[in-house]
Amino acid sequence: MHPLGPDGKVPRDGGARCNYTDEFTPGPAALINGAPRLLFLPVSGPAGMGETVRSMQIAYAARRRWPDAKPHFALSREAPLAADFPFDCTLLPASPTFHSAEVSQLIASLQPDVVIFDNSGRTRQLRAARAAGARIVYISSRPRQRRKAFRWRWRRMIDEHWIAYPRFLAGSLSWLERFKLRLQPQSTVRYLDVILPAPTPQAEARAAQRLGVATTPFALFVAGGVTNHPHAIDAVRIFVAAAKRCAAMGHRTVLIGTGEQAAAADAQLITLPRLPADELIALLRRAQVVVTNGGATLLQAMASGAACIAVPIAGDQPERIRRCVRAGVALAAPLAESAMAAQAAELLGSAAQRAALVESCQRLKLADGLAIAVQGLECLLRERGDS
């Protein structure tokens, strides 16, 4: 058993496995090779797609690290991305959490090296992964799922627990969580901070040119994957109306992923379909102001150097946004057309306020969550290869 230090970390000693880290340390290039089989089980359904997109980006990062990797997903057939999914996929009537028999059968059939549960999972499913000899990653982005991951029964099965948000949003480990890690040092906790696919400068410039935002400063409105979210049925409509109002004030405005088409009268409005992650990041890097919900896009915008206005559209987002405001890294606006447009216009007109927000974001030193995830997978695959 490794004692915890005063900062809640387990010291790295004697080659022992560290069970608390949010720092990325590159491993040897040849740490593990071959074609790892990775099974992703993100919570999915007709409303929202944050977990699916996060798991997709981790799968892409794994493919870059291991070109012959074999990612496989199980998704609800109602998920917004299910119809045109870029990886091998098993479609289920609802989220994988509700289909333990099918998920257990899939695990037994695929014999994955690692199973990644993203905000999903049942005890039966974790046991099936263990029975197949797989290593288990559990990603939590909400307090309830984090508590589940720290239950004694699950702690014995989970090899890596990845907390999807940075510490200033998700909170540091509690004394009880540190105590449980001390008793079970074989399990690792990592903060992913921000999932940020990084286009090259050349790719960013090409994307900006293609999308028509290469030169003119603009405000970017990104509603996110909230089309049918039960907590914000009208969110997309309100984002569209707010973007149009901002454009009508004379500000160059870009609206992404709502299906809306700009009318001829909307001279200052550019409407774009849902974009690949690297093109979205290219726009976030170039936008003066980003208006988005309190999910993953907010963190991506902050890490990209944009001044952000956060709008809550789901039940877990108001507290997250309050923490961002307290940290001085974002402004908050209600889900209301006039307030969103007015705040965007005000921030566009204040270079000093934008600079203060960006400077506060830079002080956070948000880590690259994809690099951290790949490091975790390398660790698990090395252990599996040695077992």
Give the location of each predicted region:
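C-terminal alpha-helical cap of glycosyltransferases
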Residues: 366-387
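Conserved donor-nucleotide binding/catalytic region of nucleotide-linked donor-dependent transferases
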Residues: 331, 337, 343-363, 383-384
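Short acidic alpha-helix that forms the nucleotide-activated donor recognition element
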Residues: 103-105, 276-287, 302-303
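Catalytic donor nucleotide-activated moiety binding site of glycosyltransferases and closely related
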Residues: 75-84, 223, 247-273
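A nucleotide-sugar donor-handling region in carbohydrate enzymes
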Residues: 157-225, 258
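Acidic donor-binding loop of glycosyltransferase active sites
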Residues: 285-295
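Conserved catalytic-core segment of nucleotide-activated headgroup transferases in glycan assembly
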Residues: 54, 58, 200, 215-258
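Active-site and donor-binding regions of nucleotide-sugar-utilizing enzymes
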Residues: 39-65, 72-179
